[in-house]
């Protein structure tokens, strides 16, 4: 029941958002505001629709790691432009402030995307991205893992409480991440380089050695998990 309800709600949500984005764009055109309005269509993560035998999000694989991000900025961003730079939702605040002509605080996380949207990617722009999921045990039952990607390759480590496994994917030859190449001699230098970058990212981000308690409840004795197992959260027919 959970999968059926989840996916149906998800598809209904997409249809509703699509319809109402269309209404908003029509309004901007009708009122003449479109020429002086920046429209950004985005999400906080991707979503699985059966890939890797999964639905929902949480894993580091491409289907949920990648996030929709479309920009319409008349006179600034060239229509039809596709950019493959690594950006993140942490960049949004700086971007919106700069677009609005407001001061961007020096201590804010993320960087403004305005130069990229103008077609001028800074030479020192990020070339890798770190991801970390630690909400286990929890009723989603997604194992703790972290990893790093440079857009071409992705290194992942699954850890605790009883696993210590690595995966490495070549996203050019294996875009769906079906076959890990971790440990293969021809990828030795790539693997070593990504491990070095992974450790660097963890230092820079000050990732604690010990994870905080899972935020979604943990294990068979968790009140949250118990309610789910007993069917107390099932929808009424």
State where each predicted segment sits.
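C-terminal cap/loop subdomain of S1 sulfatases and analogous C-terminal strand-loop tails that border
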Residues: 45-51, 90-93, 98-167, 171, ...
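A long, amphipathic alpha-helix that forms part
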Residues: 1-37
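Beta-strand elements within well-structured catalytic alpha/beta cores of enzymes
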Residues: 14-17, 21, 38-43, 69-71, ...
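Histidine-centered active-site microenvironments of extracellular/periplasmic hydrolases
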Residues: 26-81, 88, 139
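Solvent-exposed, polar/charged alpha-helical surfaces in well-ordered, non-transmembrane soluble domains
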Residues: 19-22, 26, 94, 98, ...
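Active-site rim elements
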Residues: 1-12, 56, 76-87, 99-104, ...
């Amino acid at each position: 029941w959970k999968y059926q309800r989840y996916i149906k709600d998800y598809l209904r949500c997409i249809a509703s958002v699509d319809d109402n984005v269309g209404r908003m764009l029509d309004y901007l055109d009708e009122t003449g505001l479109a020429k002086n309005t920046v429209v950004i269509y985005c999400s906080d993560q991707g979503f699985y629709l059966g890939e890797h035998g999964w639905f929902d999000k949480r894993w580091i694989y491409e289907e949920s790691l990648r996030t929709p991000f479309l920009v319409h900025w008349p006179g600034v961003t060239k229509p039809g432009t596709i950019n493959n730079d690594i950006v993140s939702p942490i960049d949004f605040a700086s971007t919106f402030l700069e677009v609005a002509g407001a001061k961007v605080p020096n201590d804010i996380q993320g960087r403004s995307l305005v130069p990229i949207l103008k077609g001028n990617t800074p030479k020192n722009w990020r070339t890798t991205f770190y991801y970390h999921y630690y909400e286990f045990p929890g009723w989603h039952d997604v194992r703790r893992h972290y990893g790093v990607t440079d857009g071409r390759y992705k290194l992942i480590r699954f850890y605790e409480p009883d696993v210590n496994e690595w995966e490495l994917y070549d996203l050019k030859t294996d875009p769906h991440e079906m076959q890990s190449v971790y440990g293969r001699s021809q990828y030795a230098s790539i693997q070593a380089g990504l491990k070095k970058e992974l450790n660097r990212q963890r230092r820079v981000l000050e990732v604690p050695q010990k994870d905080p308690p899972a935020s979604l409840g943990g294990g068979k004795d968790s009140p949250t998990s118990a309610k789910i197992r007993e069917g107390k959260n099932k929808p009424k027919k």
